[in-house]
Amino acid sequence: MSIFKGSAVALITPFTQDGVNFDELKKLLEWHIKNKTDAIVICGTTGEASTMSLNERKETIKYTVETVNKRIPVIAGTGSNNTKSSVEMSIWAEKIGVDGVLVITPYYNKTTQKGLIEHFKSINDNINIPIILYNVPGRTGLNILPETLYAMRDLKNICAIKEASGNISQIAKIKALCRDRFDIYSGNDDQIVPILSLGGSGVISVLANIIPQTVHDMCFSYFQGKTTDALNLQLDTLSLTNSLFIETNPIPIKTAMNLLNFNAGPLRLPLCSMDEKNLNTLKTDLKGYGLIK
């Protein structure tokens, strides 16, 4: 039940001062389809879902599904630290036509590994579309252990994991335990090729917001056996990637997009404008990559 192979953009949400800029969202979606993005992830971390109202999230997901119109998969962020809310949002997302859901581990209240299994099972048992688990312990304080993922192998709708732990050894252990049962997507743009080398299926990418073709090419060069080409793309984009995470994501990527004349709009508090020194570093890397003058 694989959803996509290659590069899914973790899409920013373009805002106006008081809402979502749907005109700009449409332009971004069309641009990504034209520039080889393989799937759209909407209302995730990079999309600032945590500072959007429920109605805004629903309107944005529905608009994305309607605009993309099955040309590439649309994956909606539907998770929270409340199991009932996660289930309800996932049921709603399936009804309006998303191709899959991205479900983060519960945060703040955290739970145990047993609680994780029960949380994800509740979502699995209430929908019939693919589920990607999202493991990002640096944000949630909770790590999905390889053994825990293996214990969920019989939950038929759980098809993949977005691995943003940064722990290559853990990802190798996932592959060793689970083999081909789950797709593994890199959640870190500086680890795309390393995770592909462990049998990964692609990336859910922040970097693809500004260079989608390159991230797609990195993945498909690897899939086609052109591993040196893929590695060179990984290394060539490393400095730019580092700049995009010099402050909390999505502060730098949204700043970069505004510098590139996308109408990404403002960040929502508590996210704020970049420190001047970090902004200059970002500008230097954007210039170095030929994206701005």
Curated annotation (Swiss-Prot):
Pfam family, one: DHDPS
InterPro entries in UniProt: Aldolase_TIM, DapA, DapA-like, Schiff_base-form_aldolases_AS, Schiff_base-form_aldolases_CS
Places the protein is found: Cytoplasm
Catalytic activity: L-aspartate 4-semialdehyde + pyruvate = (2S,4S)-4-hydroxy-2,3,4,5-tetrahydrodipicolinate + H2O + H(+)
Pathway the protein takes part in: Amino-acid biosynthesis; L-lysine biosynthesis via DAP pathway; (S)-tetrahydrodipicolinate from L-aspartate: step 3/4
Biological process according to GO: diaminopimelate biosynthetic process; lysine biosynthetic process via diaminopimelate
EC numbers, comma separated: 4.3.3.7
Keywords: Amino-acid biosynthesis, Cytoplasm, Diaminopimelate biosynthesis, Lyase, Lysine biosynthesis, Schiff base
SMART domains: DHDPS
Annotated positions for site Part of a proton relay during catalysis: 45, 108
Gene Ontology cellular component terms for the protein in this record: cytosol
Primary residence: cytoplasm
Record-listed pyruvate binding positions: 46, 204
Keyword hit for Amino-acid biosynthesis: yes
Tree of life domain: Bacteria
Amino-acid biosynthesis as UniProt keyword: yes
GO terms, molecular function: 4-hydroxy-tetrahydrodipicolinate synthase activity
Active-site residues per Swiss-Prot or TrEMBL entry: 134, 162
Subunit architecture: Homotetramer; dimer of dimers.
Family, similarity comment: Belongs to the DapA family.
Free-text function comment from the UniProt entry: Catalyzes the condensation of (S)-aspartate-beta-semialdehyde [(S)-ASA] and pyruvate to 4-hydroxy-tetrahydrodipicolinate (HTPA).
Protein name: 4-hydroxy-tetrahydrodipicolinate synthase 1
